[in-house]
């Protein structure tokens, strides 16, 4: 804990321990102490991830009276005109990775990308939440690979990932490429100057 002496804890509003562990590792690179806050916050339906994250961060900051950040991400598949995009969580819960593979079964073009939006809000300030984005290009592979990670990780292979799906990578490896890690690093660099 001495690494983080005199640093303000920032609270990550999520119920997803996998997301939290990824975020904690990235923010630790910047010596930013992070705590998980499992809090129900508003998640609007919108085609824009930044709007979703911004609304959730504002609501969570008001409810908790703490400086918080939220992260929302989506998988955008080019052959499906960007579907599932901001609805990725719902689609994953209803169709899963096998459903996505079935939909893409006869598609030759399997290009896709993950997009992440991180939003920070401090209830002591009247300003709009600050947002940060990360994006990783890749493709949907033809069958699930690996046992690490969560969500769409077994079917997404990032560009430059040496032919590995996210689910075949350790958290440290995944954080070299991931959309979430990119957005979190942008947030961390900004947050260092903020505190």
For the regions a protein language model found, what residue spans apply to each?
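Anionic-ligand binding patches
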Residues: 2-11, 18-195
